[in-house]
Swiss-Prot record:
PANTHER family per UniProt: NICOTINAMIDE MONONUCLEOTIDE ADENYLYLTRANSFERASE (PTHR12039), NICOTINAMIDE_NICOTINIC ACID MONONUCLEOTIDE ADENYLYLTRANSFERASE 1 (PTHR12039:SF21)
Reaction equation(s) it catalyzes: beta-nicotinamide D-ribonucleotide + ATP + H(+) = diphosphate + NAD(+); nicotinate beta-D-ribonucleotide + ATP + H(+) = deamido-NAD(+) + diphosphate
Domain of life of the native organism: Eukaryota
This protein's encoding gene: NMNAT1
Key words of the record: ATP-binding, Magnesium, NAD, Nucleotide-binding, Nucleotidyltransferase, Nucleus, Phosphoprotein, Pyridine nucleotide biosynthesis, Transferase, Zinc
Lineage, opening ranks: Eukaryota, Metazoa, Chordata, Craniata, Vertebrata
Protein name per its UniProtKB record: Nicotinamide/nicotinic acid mononucleotide adenylyltransferase 1
Activity control summary: Activity is strongly inhibited by galotannin. Inhibited by P1-(adenosine-5')-P4-(nicotinic-acid-riboside-5')-tetraphosphate (Nap4AD).
Residues reported in the UniProt entry to bind NAD(+): G15, S16, F17, M23, K57, W92, T95, G158, D160, L170, W171, E217, N221
Length: 281
């Protein structure tokens, strides 16, 4: 299939990235190889979208630091970048809305190829919008974009994210339907995760199974942000588990400790609080 006939895809990964790890970066590479390998798609960009502070997850440090670490991790990437829109929202933003934002941003780029992303300032200062440098090589002319059509945003995640759809009140059923029906999911499965069975046992996932791409991770990697934070609390090395620049940044700012892990303890996770309140209402 010629490139002009392939559907261009933008991979969007939402999450805490607390901190970002080498495994997060591997998800993009695995998904890109798989999607390009189908012969139907061409992955043109990857976007990392750190969640805002209003998510209220236990141990979640400031979005300012999480965004910077993600930017350091992707500094040498030619196709994966960090977007700060979600992290700047005062309230927690549903994943479906984040997907819609990026899809609309792509559509708007047809008329205005120069799209800017907000930048976080240090905690305690007023957040403001500012222009962010863009790689000139990634810009496309108006005519090229019109010819190829608007790229499709698809959500990139791990198997644990997929299985979270089954947690009561964590997701609105209509949001799951919108994510799967309007955008699609690319799920990297780990050893021990039976994602196919989970899809089979869920009516809504089964209905949209053709828009769920399961990618096997043959070279297994069990790195997680939780394990990284645990190692740091215990004074253990995280070398080769996170990008070197991220490790240096964490050490310089002493980001993770027993105290930071207690942040938001006793606070109900934002989606659970919102969805539970709406159910009662």
């Amino acid at each position: 299939m010629e490139n002009s006939e392939k559907t261009e895809v933008v991979l969007l990964a939402c999450g805490s990235f607390n901190p970002i790890t080498n495994m997060h970066l591997r998800l993009f590479e695995l998904a890109k190889d798989y999607m390009n390998g189908t012969g139907k798609y061409k992955v043109i960009k990857g976007i990392i979208s750190p969640v805002g502070d209003a998510y209220k997850k236990k141990g979640l440090i400031s979005a300012y630091h999480r965004v910077i670490m993600a930017e350091l991790a992707t500094k040498n990437s030619k196709w994966v970048e960090v977007d700060t829109w979600e992290s700047l929202q005062k309230e927690w933003t549903e994943t479906a809305k984040v997907l819609r934002h990026h899809q609309e941003k792509l559509e708007a780029s047809i008329c205005d190829p120069q799209q800017n992303s907000p930048v976080l300032e240090k905690p305690g200062r007023k957040r403001k919008w500012a222009e962010q440098k863009q790689d000139i090589s990634e810009k496309k002319s108006l005519e090229q974009t019109k010819t190829k059509g608007v790229p499709k945003v698809k959500l990139l995640c791990g198997a644990d994210f997929l299985e979270s759809f089954g947690v009561p009140n964590l997701w609105k059923s209509e949001d799951i339907t919108k994510i799967l029906g309007d955008y699609g999911l690319i799920c990297i499965t780990r050893a021990g995760n039976d994602a196919q069975k989970f899809i089979y046992e869920s009516d809504v996932l089964w209905k949209h199974q053709n828009n769920i791409h399961l990618v096997n991770e043959w070279i297994t990697n069990d790195i997680s942000s939780t394990k990284i934070r645990r190692a740091l609390r215990r004074g253990q090395s995280i070398r080769y588990l996170v990008p070197d620049l991220v490790e240096e940044y964490i050490e310089k700012h002493n980001l993770y400790s027993s105290e930071s892990e207690e942040r938001n303890v006793g606070v109900v996770l934002a989606p659970l609080q919102r969805n539970t309140t709406e159910v009662k209402a």
